[in-house]
Design a protein with these regions (language model features):
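Pyridoxal 5′-phosphate
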Residues: 1-395
Length: 395
């Protein structure tokens, strides 16, 4: 697929969502509305992955690894364009939590003696990660939600002169709430704090502009709305924070030797051993990136740019709007704001066990979280027939 508009722009031609549906085989086997848990691969990503596996089986060394490094670099550039960042601000990561942990470890000096402010609509593993850091003397302030929305007044009261970091999810995995990160950035920066944003449930689903939003650091995996695989993701670190406020937690780079037998061209002005650290955001990478992940990400990011994130969001909104109207009539109480623009909606469910049994019997997939919270997350390949199938099963 050719590179078309950037993530927040509309494509030159309206997307053909029925054609797109045919590109996702999962749509033929079930009404899969659990994309916030794991997104199915398209036929294009699957074919690209098969080509790589075929090369691993039959063609290793022909050509050598640099040929596949181009796919990796292309994925990096496509993601940078998606969130309006520079390529040098993007590192590869194995997961969102790992990326955020590396940032926290690299900010140890900056965080010392201060506090981190977050809220209870953040991802639970992230909250646990923060909580464990209290053992090192770091104060963690978790602001409770009010009516399933971020309490901005309480956030403002919690952010003070000792706050070093404010951390939120742009889109909550709990109910799909889109956080006002621009306002949180202004609150944080006014008090000398930085803003980290978990974009796991946002990247590929809603437009992101890290510059306009005032985001200092962000991370995501690719197996949700970026339509990739597990074990591969991205970390964004603003350029002027790299190596200073955010130091690499594991040092990467290489060395060259200025003595025989390593070289017969000695440089008399150079040191015997030259250490060359990794530059840019790559200094935060703690392992060799997965080429399987890069190849899937490259293909899916091309697809996302071609369709356009705004078009993807508008399509999903047409499905979630219907759910917001019809499910309350069946006794399900929405905990997602009606004006919310993410593709995730959640409902308090009167009888979770019975509801899930009905849905499974009808071939409908959703998630049940936190006991009785039914989370429904349609994507680009879903249609009104999928929604009808869900509603009929629960009627």
């Amino acid at each position: 697929m050719s590179e078309q508009p950037s993530g927040g722009e509309l494509p030159a031609h309206p997307a053909d969502f029925e054609r797109i549906r045919k590109d996702f085989p999962r749509a033929r086997t079930a009404a899969f509305l659990d994309n916030a848990s794991s997104h199915p691969l398209s036929v294009h990503s699957t074919a690209a992955l098969h080509r790589y596996v075929e090369w691993l089986s039959h063609g290793v060394g022909e050509p050598w690894w640099p040929a596949w490094a181009g796919n990796r670099d292309d994925a990096q550039g496509l993601f940078a364009r998606l969130i309006h960042a520079d390529r040098e601000e993007i590192a590869f990561a194995r997961s969102t939590v790992e990326a955020e942990s590396n940032v926290l470890n690299g900010m140890a000096e900056h965080l010392a003696g201060g506090n981190i402010v977050t809220c209870d609509l953040a991802y639970s593993a992230v909250l646990y990660n923060y909580q464990m850091r209290q053992q090192d003397g770091l104060e963690i302030r978790v602001v409770p939600n009010v009516d399933w929305q971020i309490d901005m007044d309480a956030m403002e009261r919690s952010i003070d002169g000792d706050t070093r970091l404010v951390s939120v999810a742009l889109v909550s995995n709990v109910n799909g709430l889109i956080a006002d990160v621009r306002a949180l950035s202004e609150l944080a920066h006014a008090r000398g704090a930085l803003l980290f944003v978990d974009i796991m449930q946002a990247a590929g689903a809603v437009p992101i502009d890290v510059q306009a939003m005032g985001i200092d650091m962000a991370a995501c995996s690719t197996f949700k709305w970026l339509m990739g695989v597990k074990g591969y993701g991205f970390l964004y670190v603003r350029a002027n924070l790299q190596g200073s406020v955010v130091k690499p937690s594991q040092h990467s780079g290489g060395v060259s030797f200025n003595y025989e037998p390593w070289t017969n061209r000695l440089d008399p002005e150079a040191e015997p051993i030259h250490f060359k650290p990794t530059e840019g955001a790559g200094q935060y990478e703690v392992s060799y990136p997965s080429y399987e992940g890069a190849i899937c990400a490259q293909e899916s990011l091309r697809f996302i740019h071609e369709v356009g994130v705004e078009a993807i969001r508008t399509h999903a909104r047409s499905l979630t709007d219907r759910l917001q109207v019809e499910l309350p009539r069946l006794g399900y109480t929405s905990i997602t704001p009606r004006a919310n623009d993410s593709p995730i909606v959640s409902f308090t469910t009167p009888d979770p066990t019975a509801a899930m049994a009905k849905l499974r019997a009808a071939g409908v997939h959703v998630a049940m979280r936190f006991g009785d919270k039914m989370r429904i997350a349609p994507s680009v390949y879903n249609n009104q027939d999928d929604v009808s199938q869900l509603l009929e099963a629960l009627a």
